[in-house]
């Protein structure tokens, strides 16, 4: 079921990691309905972070056995997984920090 939750900065979507089987579920906050559900690339889905422009969700997954943990990247406009990156085995939480270009 739902494990960690994050609301997109624009306030339109709620993204949930699904523990126990691994996956992601996205809800439209205006209607309260699920608009997308997908299995993650591993079973230990954990943390959720959203890009500042509300376009992408990043979900961390713990590694199982000797498999590495992963961060899956989901496009919240196209509603599909667009990438996956191997990370350390204990990839529990995740945070997104927006960096602004320096003024000259």
For the regions a protein language model found, what residue spans apply to each?
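Predominantly soluble domains enriched in secretory-pathway, periplasmic, or organellar proteins
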Residues: 1-104
């Amino acid at each position: 079921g739902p494990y960690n939750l994050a609301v997109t900065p624009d306030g339109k979507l709620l993204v949930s990691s699904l523990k126990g089987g691994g996956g992601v579920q996205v809800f439209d906050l205006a209607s309260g309905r699920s608009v997308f559900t997908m299995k993650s690339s591993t079973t230990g889905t954990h943390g959720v972070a959203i890009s500042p422009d509300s376009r992408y969700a990043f979900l961390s997954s713990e590694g199982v056995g000797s498999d590495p943990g992963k961060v899956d990247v989901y496009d919240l406009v196209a509603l599909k997984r667009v990438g996956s990156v191997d990370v350390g085995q204990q990839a529990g939480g995740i945070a997104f920090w927006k960096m602004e270009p320096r003024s000259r």
